[in-house]
Each structure stands twice: as C-alpha cells, then as structure tokens.
C-alpha cells in the first residue's frame, strides 16, 4: 500500500504491475533526456552570441528533428502495446470472481463455488483494531489464492464505479448493465488495498477494497468452511 510522502508507484505484486513500473521508468528516462536537451539548447541560446541568424536552408537539421521524434515515439509505443495486449490475455483462469459496485459498498460472488457470496463494507473508525488502517479496512476481506490467474468480472448496480488495486496493476470501470473483465494474480501472500476510483456520490471515499492472498491449500479450506457455514 502507499506510504506517507511516497513519490513513486506502489511495490508490484503481480507480473503486470512489474511490467507497468518498468515501462513507467522507461518513459520517464526518455522524458528526462528530452527535457535535459531542451534546457541545454535554451541555455545556449541565452548565453551564446548568434552568428548564423540569416541561415534559411538547413536540410540536415530538419531531417534530424523530424526523424528523431518519430524514433522516440516508436520506442514508447512498442512496449506500451506489448503491455496492453498482456493485460487482455486470459489463459485458463483458476478462479472467477465477480465484483458488483453499489452505493457505497462492494459485493463479491465466487462463480466457481455454489452460494459463495458476500458484501464488503468499510469498517467504521471506532471498530478498528490496533494496526488497521482508517478508510481502508472492510468487514469482509476478499480471500484469493496466490500464484493463480484470477478472472475478475466487474459491474455495477446503480452508478459508475471503478474497481482498482494499484499494487496489482488493476483498474477497471464498473458500469451498470455492462460486464467488464480483468485478469489479476499475486506472486506472494498478503493484504493488498484499493479503493473505488470513480466519483460515485457523497460516500465515494468510503468504498475500500481489501484482497487477502493466501496459499492454495488454505484457500480451499477457507472456501469449504464458508460453504459448510452457509448450509
């Protein structure tokens, strides 16, 4: 999760987020080099006496400042398209989880398990335990297996919402009457926090998302326990 005064992105816990952070650093380095070059040229213009003010024809420099930006754009576009196609790959997901946005809470349905569904509300401040985070904790955490491809089906029952977990590199709009799809996976166990990222009304700030990734065998035990309890 984010920390106070953090300037960079959150630590990645999924392969997609690792690719996004690498692309972010790649694009930032290109921007830094361009900015340095422009600043250098501006400083030269302000400090150097111009001796060729009457030059009207410079084919070489015109070719350079036409071709060079095109090459830079290609260097940015190719990795961007690669990541875009990676986020749309769905190869035999282990589990399907449906997230439904409401004003102002989330509902979750495990499509592969019969009658396994629950609502997830924000935990009020006066119910927080020591070490829990204000405005980020929920009463029912979403438990998922780690190191598994999980297909998310995201929709809404009322207004526009957005299901976002930054450390997993997932941000998908929840639209009434439409079912959007996303893929997520975590390479390590732990708690990962997110929030609704679409202004959806007066309590938009009170729609946190908490994902708890655990080991396969522990997840099966958890799912079996919930199924027995629901009988």
From Swiss-Prot:
Broad EC category: translocase
Binding residues for Cu cation A1: 161, 196, 200, 207
EC numbers for this chain: 7.1.1.9
GO biological process per UniProt: ATP synthesis coupled electron transport
Membrane topology, as annotated: Multi-pass membrane protein
Cofactor annotation: Cu cation
Mitochondrial matrix compartment residues: 46-59
Binding site for Mg(2+): 198
Residues binding Cu cation A2: 196, 198, 200, 204
Pfam families: COX2 (PF00116), COX2_TM (PF02790)
Cofactor note: Binds a dinuclear copper A center per subunit.
PROSITE patterns (alphabetical): COX2, COX2_CUA, COX2_TM
Mitochondrial intermembrane topological domain residue ranges: 1-14, 88-231
GO molecular function: copper ion binding; cytochrome-c oxidase activity
Record-annotated membrane-spanning stretches: 15-45, 60-87
Places the protein is found: Mitochondrion inner membrane
Catalytic activity annotation: 4 Fe(II)-[cytochrome c] + O2 + 8 H(+)(in) = 4 Fe(III)-[cytochrome c] + 2 H2O + 4 H(+)(out)
General function of this protein: Component of the cytochrome c oxidase, the last enzyme in the mitochondrial electron transport chain which drives oxidative phosphorylation. The respiratory chain contains 3 multisubunit complexes succinate dehydrogenase (complex II, CII), ubiquinol-cytochrome c oxidoreductase (cytochrome b-c1 complex, complex III, CIII) and cytochrome c oxidase (complex IV, CIV), that cooperate to transfer electrons derived from NADH and succinate to molecular oxygen, creating an electrochemical gradient over the inner membrane that drives transmembrane transport and the ATP synthase.
Family statement drawn from the similarity comment of this UniProt entry: Belongs to the cytochrome c oxidase subunit 2 family.
Subunit description: Component of the cytochrome c oxidase (complex IV, CIV), a multisubunit enzyme composed of 14 subunits. The complex is composed of a catalytic core of 3 subunits MT-CO1, MT-CO2 and MT-CO3, encoded in the mitochondrial DNA, and 11 supernumerary subunits COX4I, COX5A, COX5B, COX6A, COX6B, COX6C, COX7A, COX7B, COX7C, COX8 and NDUFA4, which are encoded in the nuclear genome.
Record NCBIfam families: CoxB (TIGR02866)
Protein's name according to its UniProt entry: Cytochrome c oxidase subunit 2
Native source species: Aotus nigriceps (Black-headed night monkey)
């Amino acid at each position: 999760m984010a920390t106070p005064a953090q300037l960079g992105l959150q630590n990645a816990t999924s392969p997609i987020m690792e690719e996004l952070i690498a692309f972010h650093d790649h694009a930032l380095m290109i921007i830094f080099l361009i900015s340095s070059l422009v600043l250098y040229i501006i400083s030269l213009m302000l400090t150097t006496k111009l001796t060729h003010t009457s030059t009207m024809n410079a084919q070489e420099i015109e070719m350079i400042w036409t071709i060079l930006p095109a090459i830079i754009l290609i260097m940015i576009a190719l990795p961007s398209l690669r990541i875009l196609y990676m986020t749309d790959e769905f190869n035999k997901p282990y589990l399907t989880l449906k997230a439904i946005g409401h004003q102002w809470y989330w509902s979750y349905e495990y499509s592969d398990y019969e009658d396994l569904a629950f609502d997830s509300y924000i935990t009020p401040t006066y119910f927080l335990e020591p070490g829990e985070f204000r405005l980020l904790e929920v009463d029912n955490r979403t438990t998922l297996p780690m190191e598994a491809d999980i297909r998310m089906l995201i929709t809404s029952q009322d207004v526009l919402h957005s299901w976002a977990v930054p450390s997993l590199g997932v941000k998908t709009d929840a639209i009434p009457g439409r079912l959007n799809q996303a893929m997520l996976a975590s390479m390590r166990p732990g708690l990962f926090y997110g929030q609704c990222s679409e202004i959806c009304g007066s309590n938009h700030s009170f729609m946190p998302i908490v994902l708890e990734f655990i080991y396969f065998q522990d997840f099966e035990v958890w799912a079996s326990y919930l199924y027995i309890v629901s009988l």
